[in-house]
């Protein structure tokens, strides 16, 4: 099953008021790095079953630099509240961030790494994480890499800066998450999340009514 995620930039706490309108998605990603300060956890806790909290590092595609010590403390508090978050693999290792039942991610914005490089970066998180997430720039070799990564059981893969239909294609092939924007792209190559949801719902209905269409 692929979960549809509506990615929402949070520049101020007023943006949190948009969450209820996005709950037709499976999850709402709160991109807290769009602000220079982090909201009080109790403000978002009421949505804990439907949100993914992301404080993306600038070198992995984030917007504003958040003090790493503050980010680490915030993520640890989120863990205590059982709130799902997405943390970069290297940040989790450096600051000993809890990753059990969380999303552990890695982003390659300017090159396509080898499979072994990606696997070694994520190896320690395979068993305990909720999902692994790998995003790779759409340069030579990215399709082969992402397809190979889909052999892992709990993984979401996404190409960056390519035709949005490719994200749909990787979802069909087994990627567990597809991110869409909620009016403002948070990554190149995103559909609006409602469009992504409509396409996947349609493909699911086809596969149920006529399985041979998608399976051959």
From Swiss-Prot:
Key word Lyase present: yes
- The record's EC number reads 4.2.1.10
Q: Name one GO molecular function term.
A: 3-dehydroquinate dehydratase activity
The record ties this protein, via CDD domains, to:
DHQase_I
Q: According to the lineage, what is the superkingdom? A: Archaea
Q: What class of enzyme is it?
A: lyase
Pathway annotation: Metabolic intermediate biosynthesis; chorismate biosynthesis; chorismate from D-erythrose 4-phosphate and phosphoenolpyruvate: step 3/7
Q: Does the keyword Nucleotidyltransferase apply?
A: no
Q: Which reaction does it catalyse?
A: 3-dehydroquinate = 3-dehydroshikimate + H2O
Q: Which UniProt keywords apply?
A: Amino-acid biosynthesis, Aromatic amino acid biosynthesis, Lyase, Schiff base
Residues that hold 3-dehydroquinate according to the record: 7, 29-31, 56, 167, 186, 190
InterPro entries linked: Aldolase_TIM, DHquinase_I, Type-I_3-dehydroquinase
Q: Which residues form the active site?
A: 107, 133
The record's listing under Gene3D superfamilies reads:
Aldolase class I (3.20.20.70)
What biological processes does GO assign it? 3,4-dihydroxybenzoate biosynthetic process; amino acid biosynthetic process; aromatic amino acid family biosynthetic process; chorismate biosynthetic process
Q: Which Pfam families match?
A: DHquinase_I (PF01487)
| HAMAP family found in the cross-reference section | AroD
User: Subunit structure, per the record?
Assistant: Homodimer.
**What PANTHER family does its record include?**
3-DEHYDROQUINATE DEHYDRATASE
Described by its record, this protein's role is as follows: Involved in the third step of the chorismate pathway, which leads to the biosynthesis of aromatic amino acids. Catalyzes the cis-dehydration of 3-dehydroquinate (DHQ) and introduces the first double bond of the aromatic ring to yield 3-dehydroshikimate.
Name this protein carries in UniProt: 3-dehydroquinate dehydratase
Query: Which lineage do the record's taxonomy fields give for this organism?
Result: Archaea, Thermoproteota, Thermoprotei, Sulfolobales, Sulfolobaceae
Q: Which gene encodes it?
A: aroD
